[in-house]
Curated annotation (Swiss-Prot):
The active site is at H60, D103, S104. Its main location: membrane. It catalyses: a lipid A + a 1,2-diacyl-sn-glycero-3-phosphocholine = a hepta-acyl lipid A + a 2-acyl-sn-glycero-3-phosphocholine; a lipid IVA + a 1,2-diacyl-sn-glycero-3-phosphocholine = a lipid IVB + a 2-acyl-sn-glycero-3-phosphocholine; a lipid IIA + a 1,2-diacyl-sn-glycero-3-phosphocholine = a lipid IIB + a 2-acyl-sn-glycero-3-phosphocholine. One of its GO terms (cellular component) is cell outer membrane. This is Lipid A acyltransferase PagP. GO terms for molecular function: acyltransferase activity. Pfam families: PagP. Residues 1-18 form the signal peptide. SUPFAM superfamilies: OMPA-like. GO terms for biological process: lipid A biosynthetic process. It is an enzyme of class 2 (transferase). It comes from the Bacteria.
Length: 190
């Protein structure tokens, strides 16, 4: 409950701060070399389409984990979230998201982040993209401390539906296995 209240307080503070900024120049207080980042995030937030995310699968690499470990892990990473996204003037995709899902140990794992995908059009309705996501998450097994990260991201876009995947690298030292998970999620643009 404390975590939920903390998250809501941070979101309200960020919204109040954003509302206080002048709408004509929302990134005026940013350091000059970071202004393009701020401007793209602001554009995504203000001009982007609303998205609904859903997740349901986390594949643990069979070359890293023993059969016993695989059986003990949750691979149905049910969850969902909301986001905003847009295709820019070059046709590349930008997204902001907040999701929560069940991790490998069936604990709730929240994540917020930004994703960028360089896309190629297969036809009018179908696009493929490769890129990255920068995010902040927290996990029970790390005492719920916010953990920043960057991950590769790939996606197929078909009209308003997207199927995406990321690979979470990890360690394969015996007795200290972690990560090495292919995480799949979907998105519907509303």
């Amino acid at each position: 409950m404390k975590r939920l209240i903390s998250c809501l307080t941070i979101i309200c503070a960020l919204n109040a701060s954003a509302a206080a900024e002048t709408t004509s120049n929302p990134c005026s207080r940013w350091i000059s070399f970071l202004k393009p980042v701020c401007q793209r995030i602001h554009q995504t937030w203000t001009e982007g389409h609303d998205d609904m995310y859903f997740s349901g699968y986390a594949w643990h690499n069979r070359y890293v984990y023993s059969n016993e470990k695989i059986k003990s892990y949750n691979e149905t990473a049910w969850g969902g979230g909301l986001g905003k996204s847009l295709f820019d003037e070059k046709g590349n995709w930008h997204g902001l998201y907040a999701i929560a899902f069940l991790d490998s140990h069936r604990h709730l794992e929240p994540a917020v982040g930004y994703a960028y995908l360089k896309t190629a059009s297969v036809n009018k309705d179908l696009k493929a993209g490769l890129g990255y996501s920068v995010l902040v998450t927290s996990r029970v097994d790390y005492d719920n401390v916010p953990i920043p990260g960057a991950l590769p991201w790939a996606a197929l876009f078909y009209k308003r539906i997207t199927i995406a995947a990321t690979y979470i690298p990890g360690s394969s030292r015996e007795g200290h296995e972690n990560g090495n998970v292919l995480y799949m999620l979907g998105k519907i643009s509303l």
